C-alpha cells in the first residue's frame, strides 16, 4: 500500500509555507496576480460598498486549495479598513464558539471561515440571522422556561472558503451575495508570480527559468512559491545563486518533479489506474484504498490537477486513464478504451 506522506507539491498549506506566504502575499487588489474575473468582481463590489459606507456583502470563495483564498480575505479586510478574524469550519465545534467570535466583531470587520463546508448544522444555523439580519439569537433557559433573545451585531463581512462547494447546504450558499469561483492559474500568471516573488526574496531568476518553474507548479501559486524557495537553495549551494534554466532543471529533478508538475505520487496514482485497473474505470473509493489515502483527500487534493491537465476523466463507473496518460507513460493505447470513452485530448 502506498503512503502519501510529506508530499512536496501538495497544494495544501504546510509548515514552511507560513513564513513564505506571509512575506510574499500581496496586500492590495491591484497587486494580486491572476483570477481576473474574481478580481474585477471584488474591485467593483468593494468600491460600491465603500461609496455607500456599507460593509461588503458576504463572499464565498471556492476552488482547489492553494489558489489564494486566504490572501483575498486579507486584501478584502484591508480594502474595507476592517480587522480580519480567521477560523475554520472544524475549529468551530459548538454554536457557542461561533457566538463568541461574532460578539467580538466591529463594524466592517471581516470573518474568514476556511473549510466552511465542514460546519456542523447547529453552528450553521447561528450564521443565518447573523448573515441576513446582523443579529445573534441566543436561547436562555431550558424546556418550557426557555426564551430567545436577539442581540444586534455590527455590520461585518463573512468570507467563506471551500474546496467542496457542492457540500454546502442551499440555505447557507444562498446567503452569500458574492460568489467567486477560483481557477487554476495559467503559466503566464504563475511566471509573473515567480518573478514578483523572486524580487521580494532578492534572488535573480532568469525568464526561461521562471517559465519552467511555472510549468511545473501545478497551476498553484502556493506550490510555485514553495518550489522557488527550494530552487533558490539549490542554486546558492550548487551554483552562483542565480536561478537559470540549467539550475532549475537540476533542482526539480532532485525534487522528483517532472515536466508536467507530477511528483512520484502522481505517477503512482496514474500507473495504478493503468496497470492495476487496466486503465479503468476504477471507483474512487477503491483507488483511495489502494494508494492508502482518504477518499476526500484524493478528491480534493490530487484529482483536480489530474482532471484539469486531462490525464484522467470521470465516468459514471469511475475514473479512467485518458489517451494523454498512455502517451505520457509510452504505453500502447487499447482500442476498446478509445472507442468506449472517445478520448479528446
UniProtKB/Swiss-Prot annotation:
Pfam families: AAA_lid_4, RuvB_C, RuvB_N. InterPro entries: AAA+_ATPase, AAA_lid_4, DNA_helicase_Holl-junc_RuvB, P-loop_NTPase, RuvB-like_N, RuvB_C, WH-like_DNA-bd_sf, WH_DNA-bd_sf. GO terms for biological process: DNA recombination; DNA repair. The keyword Cytoplasm applies. It is found in: Cytoplasm. Residues 186-256 are annotated as: Small ATPAse domain (RuvB-S). GO terms for cellular component: cytoplasm; Holliday junction resolvase complex. Has 3 domains, the large (RuvB-L) and small ATPase (RuvB-S) domains and the C-terminal head (RuvB-H) domain. The head domain binds DNA, while the ATPase domains jointly bind ATP, ADP or are empty depending on the state of the subunit in the translocation cycle. During a single DNA translocation step the structure of each domain remains the same, but their relative positions change. This is Holliday junction branch migration complex subunit RuvB. It comes from Clostridium tetani (strain Massachusetts / E88). The lineage of its organism: Bacteria, Bacillati, Bacillota, Clostridia, Eubacteriales.
Amino acid at each position: 500500500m502506498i503512503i502519501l506522506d510529506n508530499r512536496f507539491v501538495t497544494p495544501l498549506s504546510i509548515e514552511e509555507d507560513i513564513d513564505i506566504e506571509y512575506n510574499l502575499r500581496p496586500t492590495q487588489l491591484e497587486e494580486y496576480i491572476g483570477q481576473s474575473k474574481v478580481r474585477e468582481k471584488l474591485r467593483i463590489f468593494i468600491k460600491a460598498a465603500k461609496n455607500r459606507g456599507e460593509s461588503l456583502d458576504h463572499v464565498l470563495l471556492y476552488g482547489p486549495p492553494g489558489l489564494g483564498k486566504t490572501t483575498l480575505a486579507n486584501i478584502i479586510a484591508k480594502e474595507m479598513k476592517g480587522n480580519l478574524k480567521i477560523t475554520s469550519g472544524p475549529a468551530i465545534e459548538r454554536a457557542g464558539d461561533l457566538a463568541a467570535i461574532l460578539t467580538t466583531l466591529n463594524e466592517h470587520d471581516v470573518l474568514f471561515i476556511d473549510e466552511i463546508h465542514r460546519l456542523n448544522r447547529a453552528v450553521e444555523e447561528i450564521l443565518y440571522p447573523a448573515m441576513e439580519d446582523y443579529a445573534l439569537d441566543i436561547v436562555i433557559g431550558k424546556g418550557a422556561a426557555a426564551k430567545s433573545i436577539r442581540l444586534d451585531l455590527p455590520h461585518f463581512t463573512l468570507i467563506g472558503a471551500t474546496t467542496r462547494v457542492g457540500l454546502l447546504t442551499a440555505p447557507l450558499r444562498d446567503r452569500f451575495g458574492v460568489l467567486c469561483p477560483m481557477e487554476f492559474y495559467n503559466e503566464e500568471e504563475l511566471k509573473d508570480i515567480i518573478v514578483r516573488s523572486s524580487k521580494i526574496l532578492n534572488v535573480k531568476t532568469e525568464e526561461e527559468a521562471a517559465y519552467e518553474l511555472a510549468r511545473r507548479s501545478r497551476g498553484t501559486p502556493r506550490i510555485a512559491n514553495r518550489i522557488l524557495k527550494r530552487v533558490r537553495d539549490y542554486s546558492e549551494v550548487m551554483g552562483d545563486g542565480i536561478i537559470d534554466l540549467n539550475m532549475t532543471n537540476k533542482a526539480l529533478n532532485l525534487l522528483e518533479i517532472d515536466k508536467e508538475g507530477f511528483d512520484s505520487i502522481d505517477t503512482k496514482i496514474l500507473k495504478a489506474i493503468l496497470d492495476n485497473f487496466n486503465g479503468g474505470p476504477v471507483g474512487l473509493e477503491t483507488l483511495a484504498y489502494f494508494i492508502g489515502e482518504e477518499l476526500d483527500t484524493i478528491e480534493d487534493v490530487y484529482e483536480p490537477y489530474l482532471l484539469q491537465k486531462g490525464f484522467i476523466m470521470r465516468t459514471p463507473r469511475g475514473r479512467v486513464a485518458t489517451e494523454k496518460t498512455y502517451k505520457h507513460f509510452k504505453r500502447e493505447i487499447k482500442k476498446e478504451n478509445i472507442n468506449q470513452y472517445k478520448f479528446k485530448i
